[in-house]
Design a protein with these regions (language model features):
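Long, charged N-terminal accessory/stalk domains
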Residues: 111, 119-164, 168
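Conserved lysine of the Walker
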Residues: 28
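Conserved NTPase motor "head" modules and their coupling/switch loops across ABC/AAA+ ATPases, GTPases
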Residues: 1-23, 36-37, 49, 65, ...
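Alpha-helix boundary/capping detector
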Residues: 57-64, 150-154, 248, 272
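Nucleotide-state sensing region of NTPase/ATPase domains
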Residues: 36-119, 123-135, 186-194, 219-228
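Detector for Asparagine
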Residues: 23-24, 85, 107, 150, ...
Length: 277
């Protein structure tokens, strides 16, 4: 209901799967996106739910019947109504507790290798939120603290005590998020290597490693850079600057791999998600 380009739509997916055919801009991807959001409360195409509502609408709804489950979402700007088997779930965490994992593969997966760090952080966060129950909480807590701290940095009459309080919150949640990302990549990296060997050239060696934006105590780093942050009006250090180092035979895949090799790496990264989950 009022999701993307659909006012309403009903779709029964056979157990053996389905192939969706249609012209450009008819909403094929939006159908898959709706399934993804129903299961994970996340879209792989946008960071916020707001753009998922149809043009001119503030709310949207999705309902789905799955093996042993009936899920329903009514998403509004105030508070989403989340139900499983007709019973309301008090928060997003309880809604997701018994949901199904999702691996999203799309035409833009090449951006995992070619584009900037934002695409790779989204990859980590989409997977991490399904892999560990504390990941999503750490991520959203960090984002809230970051938004408030940046707001304070931009205002001339800021309260220094309040700024320090949010700096501590940012460091607390950021340190937890960094730890979870590092653990995630330690587990994920071997799956990526194996996936690449199974579909690419066996003699080639692909490696993916987590690169934190800052080493050492995050709170100390933030305090040391506060004058610079005030000058720029935003926080320069923290997990929102993290990245992944992707190499092929020890060299940067973005700079030295062919487009075919880059595409194989991107597919391997998605197949590794499936193996891990």
């Amino acid at each position: 209901m009022d999701f993307r380009c659909y006012g309403s739509f009903s779709w029964q997916i056979p157990q053996q799967g389905a192939i969706i055919l249609g012209n450009n801009a008819q909403g094929k991807t939006s159908l898959l996106e709706a399934v993804c959001f129903l299961l994970r409360l996340q879209s792989p195409r946008t960071a916020r739910p707001g753009p998922l509502a149809a043009h001119g609408k503030q709310a949207f709804g999705i309902r789905g019947e799955l093996p042993g489950q009936a899920r329903r979402i009514l998403w509004t700007p105030d508070a989403p109504d989340l139900r499983v088997n007709g019973e309301p779930r008090k928060d997003q965490r309880s809604y997701l507790a018994d949901s199904y994992p999702v691996v999203w593969m799309g035409n833009d997966d090449l951006s995992l290798v070619q584009a900037g760090a934002d695409a790779r952080r989204k990859y980590m966060d989409f997977l991490g939120s399904q892999w560990h129950p504390g990941y999503r909480l750490a991520l959203f807590s960090y984002r809230r603290a970051l938004k408030t701290r940046n707001y304070l940095l931009k205002h001339r009459h800021r309260d220094k005590l309040q700024l320090d309080a949010y700096t501590r919150q940012l460091a607390l949640h950021g340190t937890e998020l960094k730890s979870l990302r590092a653990s995630l990549l330690t587990l994920l990296a071997p799956h990526i290597t194996l996936a690449y060997r199974s579909i690419g050239e066996r003699e080639e060696q692909v490696a993916v490693a987590y690169r934190a934006s800052e080493e050492g105590d995050l709170y100390e780093r933030l305090c040391a850079a506060v004058d610079r942050d005030i000058r720029y009006g935003q926080t320069q250090n923290g997990p929102h600057r993290d990245d992944l180092d992707i190499t092929l035979n020890g060299r940067s895949a973005a700079q030295f791999a062919s487009e075919g090799q880059q595409r194989t790496i991107a597919i391997s990264m998605k197949l590794a998600q499936s193996s891990l989950l």
